[in-house]
UniProtKB/Swiss-Prot annotation:
Pathway: Carbohydrate metabolism; tricarboxylic acid cycle; succinate from succinyl-CoA (ligase route): step 1/1. Heterotetramer of two alpha and two beta subunits. The keyword Nuclease does not apply. Gene3D superfamilies: ATP-grasp fold, A domain, ATP-grasp fold, B domain, Succinyl-CoA synthetase domains. It comes from the Bacteria. Pfam families: ATP-grasp_2, Ligase_CoA. One of its GO terms (molecular function) is succinate-CoA ligase (GDP-forming) activity. Belongs to the succinate/malate CoA ligase beta subunit family. This is Succinate--CoA ligase [ADP-forming] subunit beta. NCBIfam families: PRK00696.1, sucCoAbeta. Residues 9-237 form the ATP-grasp domain. The lineage of its organism: Bacteria, Bacillati, Chloroflexota, Chloroflexia, Chloroflexales.
């Protein structure tokens, strides 16, 4: 789950990371009020989940509250890469001498939280990694003790912050960012840029936090911050139904119960020369309504040329899955071929229910994948 910049900066501020003064506005009048409270030059920034806001005209400076109101009226309602701007962040505009990148991310190779810093701040870190990887300094936090003081200092020295006061403040900010990352169950937390001001102090100008959806049950306050404006309708509907769905680029829709089985199913589809259109896990104990919703989500993708069901009934009853498939087909008019491999609890009843339908039966996963690939290729 992505957070807007203003939401991320509020979290950073709670951990003692210095951020610029300001607030979020939904109307030009609110933007003017915030600018009056700041009492100086401000920057008005569109709050949308896309990059390149500045180039699209979504970030503008204002010297007076009146200008802030005018600029906000121009940005609010603007369409940036398909997203409508509904909120703007009005923040203090400051001068600075240097931009730094600082971020925390899970590194699956080392199975550690890795803190990254770069002297090349203000640009996408992926671009720095591609063009000048030597400019990125990394340290892996200890899995039990977290980010240690000497590691935070190593980051500072690694990007050229040799002044003792600056290095100490940077280390404090890095440690605070790590704590925030861990406490909110984030998958990414970054400050870009973290700037060095004329007096040598550091301040966070822009920030980004992405939360791990699997940890949101521990954070109802953060879940309440969700903005689904950039979330595809199918994924939003799946989330609300308790279905794990990720759209892919292939043409074979897959409905499976269990994440491991779903990944194995996709592998076998690839083995037989096909391309999965999605990852979809209906979970354990799915009833017919959930199955119906899942099938409707799969069929909402116009690229789907065949649908493959791979259900292993343990907690999930095969007959309930079969009822859900039939119920969905009664509501969705489609000629997409469907292949079903259903085994486990009440499988005989499930097969009986499907026997009168147009579904193509399969006894094994390999057979189901092969038939699905053939069906998709024939269309």
């Amino acid at each position: 789950m992505k957070l807007h910049e203003y939401q991320a900066r509020d979290i950073l501020a709670r951990y003692g990371i210095p951020v610029t003064g300001g607030g979020v506005a939904t109307t030009p009048a609110e933007a003017r009020t915030i600018a009056e409270q700041i009492g100086g030059r401000v920057v008005v920034k569109a709050q949308v989940f896309v990059g390149g806001r500045g180039k699209a005209g979504g970030v503008k400076l204002a010297d007076t509250p009146e200008q802030a109101e005018q600029v906000a009226s121009q940005i609010l309602g603007m369409n940036i890469k398909g997203l409508t701007v509904e909120k703007v962040l009005v923040a203090e505009a400051i001068t600075y001498e240097r931009e730094i990148y600082l971020g925390a991310i899970m590194d699956r190779a080392s199975r550690r939280i890795v803190m990254m810093a770069s002297a090349e701040g203000g640009v996408e870190i992926e671009e720095v990694a591609r063009t000048n990887p030597e400019a990125i300094v990394k340290v892996a936090a200890h899995p039990m003790m977290g980010l240690l003081d000497f590691q935070a200092r190593d980051l500072a020295y690694g990007i050229g912050l040799t002044d003792g006061r600056q290095a100490r403040q940077f280390a404090q900010i890095a440690t605070a960012l790590y704590r925030a990352y861990m406490d909110v169950d984030a998958s990414l937390a970054e400050i870009n840029p973290l700037v060095v001001r004329a007096d040598g102090s550091l301040q966070a100008l822009d920030s980004k936090i992405v939360l791990d959806d699997s940890g949101l049950f521990r954070h109802p306050d953060l879940e309440a911050m969700r903005d689904s404006s950039d979330e595809p309708e199918a994924e939003q509907r799946a989330r609300e139904a308790g279905i794990t769905y990720i759209k892919l680029d292939g043409n074979i829709g897959c409905m499976v119960n269990g994440a491991g089985l779903a990944m194995a199913t996709m592998d076998v589809v690839k083995l037989y020369g096909g391309e999965p259109a999605n990852f979809l896990d209906i979970g354990g104990g799915a009833g017919k309504e959930k199955v119906k919703t899942a099938l409707q989500i799969i069929l909402s993708d116009p690229n789907v040329k065949a649908v493959m069901f791979n259900i292993f009934g343990g907690i999930t009853r095969v007959d309930e899955v079969a009822k859900g498939i039939i119920a969905a087909l009664e509501e969705v008019n489609t000629d997409v071929p469907m292949i079903a491999r259903l085994v486990g609890t009440n499988e005989e009843e499930g097969r009986r229910i499907l026997a009168e339908s147009a579904l193509i039966p399969a006894a094994t996963l390999a057979e189901a994948a092969e038939k699905a690939v053939q069906a998709a290729q024939s269309r």
